[in-house]
């Protein structure tokens, strides 16, 4: 059985983990006064100076089958002689599996260079300066010469996960790099030590200008790859910077993932699947809706058959969950599942073309039941459908494993499964499967038609496929950009607590830290720029909402004190979606007002993005602020359906302290982990 197999596997791995210890070296005998190091940055392909003695990422650290060396990341093993085992001692195995899930690097992840001295913060560029061709540290698109805005910091505090003097270059949050593009990170000699000494060029640079020699500290293949990179870097410096080649201290070149690959494959395969039928199982009486003033509505219970786009067996706690892209570019289907759904049908005169269609997906722990839910927008005059978020209608046999670990409620178990840090394939594909299910449900409602008699209407009651909106909260909001990108006919999106750049949530949300504590005893060290967190983001990139651009009408709510979708991830999401941020409280910043929010429009806003309306409202308060703004969301929805033009109305906008359990985590004094 799946439960016994998983438990037995966990026990065997736990026993195996007890044989792992971190090797330590005895200190050398003192030999006299130490000689100060010549300031520089390591570029050692053989990693003789540690994991980051070769910049990460770099294309020599990958292959077509995956990453080459994630299992050597510092801090992932446990020394059983000096440290207690974490509750699930699987981190080395998880990382080993993670490095097979991707074969290119992240669009939103950091670059790490290891210096041998403390660097002067004043010699590093501020975010606004990183797009200047003369900045001391640059991140460049090699195909176009475009400079990416970044946050450049020197991490001086060493811990089990990283060495000291770790120069870190993070794409500015909300400004992801291009998909499937080669980037070069460049460090120049106007970066100095705290003593004022300029960094000296890595000795590797001179070796790359020479024919390969076996005495060089690299293989012939590494030399050939790096020499090719260096040729491209030379051209980039000459053509797109004000620096001289002699200014260069160190570089790294890498390709970003084609993050849309799996999602495009699923969408292409869905086109070959007949639109499923919404199979009605019961039709409720027409009754007044307490949440939809003046409306008489019927709740219709139904089921729908949905394709499964992941291999393996549900619920994918430890294994399975991979999206398999076939040679024809389409995702392989692995059967179907029957999902419960509910509809709310107006008991009033239907427009000639049918009812406008709205589908909704709730947050983690939610389900398909409409009941007394507080909707994002009122449902008067629309055909409203609700589908469960992934794992909201069942967690399979995972409960037997997770309950003894403290995750006893279905909601807690659903969260562990959706944000599944125990299975890299699953954490990467869960949002893809979820997005596919809401998209297919939306398509099914576009062709939904039933006799109108139960609703007091002649003929049939049906939807109007020319007027469609998708909505979601939290987990359900995270995947809305994918759906909108896949189906440009969707007229609008209303998103509550949308999230992008999931490394923010991993670092700050108390619930994600609780999950991380299953596999490491050092979750308090997992700040935003922790390399392990950046590796997780690399795996997650294919389903991060920040990577899926669309241009439909879009209203989002971000909440400053949110402990589920933390404010950093909400603003990251908003920027990446090109949503104009209207702040009702001071926004957080990574150092650049211009990069945080190019312009702040005055409400009301209409057609601010090429004719469509795209706005994110930043509010004080907690995770459920959308409940305080149903009138505003309704105005956005109804105006769009009535006129084809969406308007974000004037305030005031409400907020409350209602929130997820727990307090957000910050690594004092660093709110952002930088």
Regions found by a protein language model. Give the residues of each.
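Bacterial N-terminal signal peptides that target proteins for export
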Residues: 2-14
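C-terminal motif of bacterial Sec signal peptides marking the signal peptidase cleavage site
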Residues: 22-25
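Acidic, low-complexity Ser/Thr/Gly/Pro-rich repeat segments typical of extracellular/periplasmic
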Residues: 29-315
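Cap/lid segment of the alpha/beta-hydrolase catalytic domain
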Residues: 312-338, 350-448, 453-456
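Catalytic active-site module of serine/aspartate enzymes centered on a nucleophile-bearing elbow/loop
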Residues: 613-674
